[in-house]
């Protein structure tokens, strides 16, 4: 371990000069939000040559790292801010809540200036550089961490970004603030990055995109580059991934590529490729359209909804059509209609028409089917609700999925994990399909087959039993045990069946076909399902999150639910026969 001051001595002996920490603070430093930081916050600088992989940052967990007292860490060179993040260092006599290994491998062999805008003049002396990434072995063992849903080891996550598959690995990126631990921190946006060989066991890779200057790295997607383009993936075997994302310095849509199979990423020198065109441009969805040999971008631009753009080189873009009322995080992919056999496209995202527009749904997960010729999307259906949430948002499908499946992961927005060193998690990977229900093509969500490999021992196996038998058998289920529950039931005519999972209640009426979901007595969603025979349902019960799938995914839910909440782990009420009930424990994806 090398303290920075020790490193200073070593480099001075080699002939390198260092700037000394100033005695006075700067008069009007600004945080990323533009809010002046308090006068007592000082700028402490030290120029070093980076010869290690990580700077070890001893940090305190904060509710909001940009409020007064926040500290700003910067890496500067050549008069530019190359990196920054807001945080709070542990004081001289304070025990840090956690150590964050801040990755500086990008700057190895380079002389940079470390700048700390801090109220603690001695902070530099307590920082260490080394080549070891410190990882708390107990970080994945917290009582509220999900056992089979992905969550970051440390810090905040939100939108899923840029999911793709290549060379045996599934990649997911996500909006991340890795230094705020379990606080709610939707700022200082990085792109976190994790990989998996099987869609269920995940390993964190280095941060893919860091904010620089007063920049933010907001949401986006991955496109597979198909042909040589000057400045993009030169010397890399094609097709190769290109990240498309929103950045704020300068504001616009930016690109990044990887020289080493996705482990590290470099911003394109010609950014931004799409300057600001609306009042809130963000979240580019970019894909290759084979029929027209062109790239297509769908971009949220504020009041005008989604805008479609077209390019042949990922750099020069032409606007082709608009879809009003859509909001944030667009997704777009082809699927075959089960009713007509026609190849259609699915436009997916948040649909948010103004209240004065009558007859329109409003949904944080919505879809519309239509035809697409490479320039114009022509709807053939109305906009419909898709996933019913309420904790499901900003979802993307995997590009280049090896089995040709549309597989989607979303952010389970609003989930709670008290006391943990992280905040928020991802949904299970869900296979999408179009199925015919009630004469129309319906977008359905179901866990991918790979999730079944996480099943442990069977805990309950019942055939042709009553609800009372289920309640009796399930009394012994431990609340902290993650579960996979599948059931098939046949309600009597014009009956109401209730299924209780912790504090959640699903109520199905055979008379109306209506399915409602309530959380601790408050209704949070209602829909209709159209079973042809027994009613099938599946419940994936994890710590902090429950996902439910009815009638082959016709209705899908993702709901925040602590295992310490009141209510039985699983129970059924009503006049019905449970034809089959299988309950398995679920293995911990974080076990070595």
Where are the regions that the model predicts?
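Conserved Ser/Thr-centered positions that define the repeating blades of beta-propeller domains
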Residues: 196, 258-259, 308-311, 371
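Hydrophobic core segments of beta-strands in well-ordered, beta-rich domains
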Residues: 57-58, 114-115, 159-183, 204-208, ...
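Exposed aromatic-hydrophobic patches
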Residues: 45, 97-105, 221, 333
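Bacterial Sec-dependent N-terminal signal peptides
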Residues: 1-22
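Beta-rich accessory regions
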Residues: 32, 41-58, 64-77, 113-116, ...
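Extracellular carbohydrate recognition and processing domains
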Residues: 58-60, 74-108, 119
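Short carbohydrate-recognition loop motifs
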Residues: 25-36, 515
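Surface loop/turn signatures of beta-propeller and other carbohydrate-active proteins
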Residues: 34-38, 81-95, 124-162, 181-185, ...
């Amino acid at each position: 371990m090398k303290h920075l001051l020790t490193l200073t001595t070593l480099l001075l002996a080699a002939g390198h000069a260092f700037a000394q920490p100033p005695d006075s603070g700067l008069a009007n430093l600004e945080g990323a939000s533009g809010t002046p930081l308090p006068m007592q916050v000082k700028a402490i600088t030290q120029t070093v040559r980076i010869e290690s992989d990580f700077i070890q940052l001893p940090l305190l967990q904060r509710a909001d790292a940009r409020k007064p007292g926040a500290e700003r860490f910067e890496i500067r060179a050549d008069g530019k801010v190359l990196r920054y993040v807001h945080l709070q260092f542990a004081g001289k006599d304070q025990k840090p809540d956690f150590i964050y290994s801040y990755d500086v491998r990008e700057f190895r062999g380079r002389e940079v200036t470390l700048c700390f805008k801090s109220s603690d003049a001695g902070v530099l002396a307590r920082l260490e550089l080394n080549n070891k990434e410190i990882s708390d072995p107990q970080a994945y063992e917290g009582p509220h961490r999900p056992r089979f849903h992905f969550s970051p080891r440390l810090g905040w996550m939100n939108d899923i970004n840029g999911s793709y598959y290549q060379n045996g690995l599934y990649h997911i990126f996500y909006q991340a603030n890795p230094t705020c631990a379990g606080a709610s921190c939707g700022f200082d946006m990085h792109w976190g990055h994790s990989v998996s060989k099987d869609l269920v066991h995940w390993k964190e890779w280095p941060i893919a995109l860091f904010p620089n200057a007063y920049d933010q790295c907001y949401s986006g997607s991955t496109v597979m580059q198909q042909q040589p383009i000057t400045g993009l993936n030169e010397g890399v075997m094609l097709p190769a991934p290109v990240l498309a994302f929103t950045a704020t310095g300068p504001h616009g849509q930016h690109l990044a590529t990887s020289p080493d199979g996705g482990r590290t990423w470099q911003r394109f020198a010609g950014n931004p490729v799409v300057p600001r065109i609306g009042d809130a441009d963000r979240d580019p969805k970019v894909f290759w359209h084979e029929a027209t040999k062109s790239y297509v971008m769908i971009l949220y631009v504020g009041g005008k909804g989604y805008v479609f753009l077209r390019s042949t080189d990922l750099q020069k873009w032409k606007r082709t059509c608009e879809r009003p009322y859509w909001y944030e995080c667009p997704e777009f992919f082809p699927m075959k209609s089960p009713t007509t056999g026609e190849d259609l496209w699915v436009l997916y995202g948040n649909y948010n028409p103004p209240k004065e527009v009558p007859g329109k749904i409003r949904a944080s997960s919505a879809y519309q089917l239509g035809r697409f010729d490479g320039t114009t999307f022509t709807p053939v259906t109305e906009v419909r609700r898709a996933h019913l949430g309420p904790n499901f948002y900003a979802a993307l499908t995997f590009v280049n999925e090896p089995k040709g499946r549309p597989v989607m992961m979303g952010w389970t927005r609003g989930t709670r994990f008290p006391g943990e060193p992280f905040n928020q998690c991802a949904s299970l990977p869900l296979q999408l399909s179009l199925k015919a229900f009630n004469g129309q093509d319906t977008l359905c969500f179901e866990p991918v087959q790979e999730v079944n490999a996480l099943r442990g021992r069977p805990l309950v196996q019942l055939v042709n039993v009553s609800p009372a038998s289920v309640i009796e058998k399930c009394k012994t289920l431990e609340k902290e045990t993650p579960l996979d529950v599948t059931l098939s039931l046949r309600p009597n005519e014009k009956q109401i069946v209730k299924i209780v999972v912790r504090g959640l209640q699903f109520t199905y009426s055979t008379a109306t076909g209506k399915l409602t979901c309530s959380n601790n007595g408050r209704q949070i969603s209602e829909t209709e399902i159209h079973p042809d025979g027994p009613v099938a349902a599946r419940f994936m019960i994890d710590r902090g999150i429950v996902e439910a799938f009815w009638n082959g995914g016709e209705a899908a839910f993702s709901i925040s639910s602590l295992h310490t909440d009141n209510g039985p782990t699983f129970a059924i009420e009503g006049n019905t026969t449970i034809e089959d009930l299988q309950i398995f424990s679920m293995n911990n994806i974080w076990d070595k």
